[in-house]
């Protein structure tokens, strides 16, 4: 069975902008999304953040990039009022701002792995995850994980080798 993984906005931005340090790894991640090496997920918030950030550089390219995001082989996780409420509860425990929305939609869709370069917020969430579990239980969510797995561009290749071995893709 393939891993279900949420892809954070910064992965797409680093790939699109050919970031000098993380661009190559992020481009590989985006290619692997296309190859469906894992079950990739995202949300409208990712497209909004792509549009917002890239609009500061070039509004025309920003529009194209946001539209191209929807052409990827991603399962779109829906952000609705219950996700926003849960994100607010997460922020009351560990204030990670917009990333709480990403975390809430992940948890509500039983996704416990994120590929991101935003290490600080996700490390903060991971450290306080036990404090979020009672909220998950209170909201009757069926999240099976006991933690959030954070994959970065730097450790992506090693993680990819592990999942390919465990899912017999080699």
Residue ranges of predicted features:
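Acidic, PIN/NYN-like endoribonuclease modules and their adjacent C-terminal/linker elements
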Residues: 2, 108-170
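PIN/NYN-family metal-dependent endoribonuclease catalytic core
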Residues: 5-7, 24-57, 78-79
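Short active-site oxyanion
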Residues: 35-40, 73-75, 109-113
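Acidic, metal-associated active-site segment
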Residues: 96-113
